[in-house]
Amino acid sequence: MGKGLALTMSAKWKAGLLALAMLAACGNDKGAPSPLGQAVGSVAKATLGGIKARRAGKAGTAQAPAPVTRADLEKYGIPILRAVIASRGADALLTISDDKGEVVTWSTTDGTTFSLRNGVLIQTRGMGPDLMSAQVPTLGMLGQTGGTHQRMYYFLGPEDQPTRRTYDCTMSLKGRETITIFDRKHTVTHVTETCVRPQGKIENEFWLEGATVRKSRQWASGLTGYIEFEKAVD
């Protein structure tokens, strides 16, 4: 994965704070810091200073870091998506870099991007072996218990030759649940998409809140594995 996500730390509060700091680093085209950057810069510096102090044996002088809260995110008035990739130890907050209606592209500060169509992953860039494109179910199809469809993933193989994986998929209903994302509870419908082919099986999960995919766990590639997305701020 690109540098932006790689900079996040394994501890949850470190990951959240540094991800927020990365989000804050985006400024205008003249290089001026964004309002978000100005707001969290001092917190990030203080926290990193505390980490260095503890490493130097000065834990007694280090203050406990403040966790990233919903208020921290919402006051800037921009949509924010959280992405967690367990296989890479990555946990980051993403902002929109391109919006074409149904297809929205979210990015890190170093240009790693994730494109989702109505919340369903169709493309990645900057992650090494990328998902070049995908044929995926519509939002309506996700809610059809027992519904079936084909899902196709397109990758680049040896010598940049395109390869395709085709799965036969079935939707199933897990039920109504309440999930919490950055201190806010959401009542959602949990559905599972089970996809099979002769060489194996994958399982994608979606937590639907009306017409919004509030949370998901989606397979991206053999190397990356699954990515968990949370729509933190609309």
Language model segments and positions:
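Acidic, serine/threonine-rich low-complexity disordered tracts
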Residues: 27-130, 145-234
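Surface-exposed beta-loop interaction hotspot
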Residues: 133-142
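Bacterial N-terminal signal peptides that target proteins for export
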Residues: 2-16
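C-terminal motif of bacterial Sec signal peptides marking the signal peptidase cleavage site
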Residues: 23-25
